[in-house]
Amino acid sequence: MRPSGARTSVSSSPSRMWGMTDSIASIIAHELGVEVPRVQATIDLLDGGATVPFIARYRKEVTGGMDDGQLRQLEQRLDYLRELAARKETILKSIEEQGKLTDELRQKILAVDTKARLEDLYLPFKKSRRTKAAIAREAGLGELVEKLLAGGSLDLAEGYVQEGFADAASVMAGARAIVVEDISTDADLVGEIREEYFKRGRAESAVIEGKEEEGQKYRDYFEFDEPFGDLPSHRVLALLRGENEGVLRVNFAPGEDDEFYQGIIADRTGLQAQGDPADKFRAECVRFGWRTKLAVSSAVDVRMRLKEKADQAAVSVFSKNLKDLLLAAPAGHRATLGLDPGYRNGVKCAVVDGTGKVLDTVVVYPHSGQWDKARTILSTLVNKHGVELLAVGNGTASRETEKLAKEIAGLAEGTKPQTVVISEAGASVYSASEVAAQEFPDMDVSLRGAVSIARRLQDPLAELVKIDPKSIGVGQYQHDVNQALLAAGLDTVVEDAVNSVGVDVNLASAPLLNRVAGVTPTLAENIVAYRDENGAFKSRKELLKVPRLGPKAFEQAAGFLRINGAADP
């Protein structure tokens, strides 16, 4: 969740970083199809500390009605373009300090719209270790390169033999290193080769010898070959996981023979055959430039691009799955018995009342020869507390425990409780968390999971916000994707979900309040502490009495906080 304080920003007004006309606001406006003044006004709101949920709901007149999705896209692009602008500034300063910044290069850098292209332009000016090419240049071999490329004889190398270059062969190797470095730092050439590689290349994989048995889940990839453009994100992640587990040998191949790419290099650098003595040298430079530099860097780039694209697609799917879980219809304020299934360690059980308060806990062992005893104990609890819902976790022993729950329901006096099997993903993580320890300091860790299972049936959103979104189990490859990207994406979903339905300020836990627009973790704790000391809030204005909850935070949060029974609920 973004802190309620103002953002750190690089100016988004037209500046020398963006050339004469294009501001960050105008770039985003063009991409989103929104008027520039509306984008700029929205950026100003974000910089002032306003959150996306607040802007989406209460500043429609400023944004022109942009929804949560558009505002999130604007926010992401704003961060990217500001990072790009800052990087441009750094690179321009570096090249200027080297005395190599021309007006043409400055304009090229200012016009760049991607980080990859920017780094391509910076390649020739990067300060790096002394390369073979640098050593060769210091030895004066740059002059030899000029003579050779002008059609000079290879015998000229004899005249450059010196310390460090003991014979003609080592001199020619030094000359070649100079040309190869020039090839590998030509921004336009690097970009063209990279795009051709991505357009024409193929992902290939094969099983590593001896891994056939243990790698059966990857059998679809034992003899695999598919164009990059046809690879769905889940297949990319499967290939990379198989490679990481030592089952698959994965290769991101160029898709064309070497001659195709070498032809592009020769054409773009003027290293085609000229029918003179230096043709062999030219061909050798092109071949080395491709095989040792551009083929390697292009394969690395493809791997990164495919992974990034797969990560983004996967996070999008995971986010939708999480949203569905969070916004699942709550069962409501009904007494619930939560059952956390298990074999040897028993079934952990907890009864909570309609507000989620824990009334009773017990561990029974129906799957260890004590079925009848377990049924009797739980039937007694159901009747004692008027339980209306039986929430069964879907983990180990779930099916057998569900059968037990249905028998218990059949024995209930009066209205028969309803049995529901729900996801228990993250319950064990919650059980051992600091939040759970604060909530139930005297309760055994194993029983906390049963409480969580019962409560998440009553109100999924209120309970699931206590758990790290990554622990809820939202997708098959969630541990393979970029974890920072995943955390940010899922965090956004939780924030939007909480603010879309609002929060009862007199019932909400600190973790739930923390997800409300403008409410920081400290502020959430202060709200709960004030409520515990002074009783339920009577009105929204009373929130201003909470320590550190000032007018700015109140403006952001008030619209998302409900006070049932108040004059302004």
Regions found by a protein language model. Give the residues of each.
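Phosphate-backbone recognition surface of nucleic-acid-processing proteins
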Residues: 367-379, 398, 548-568
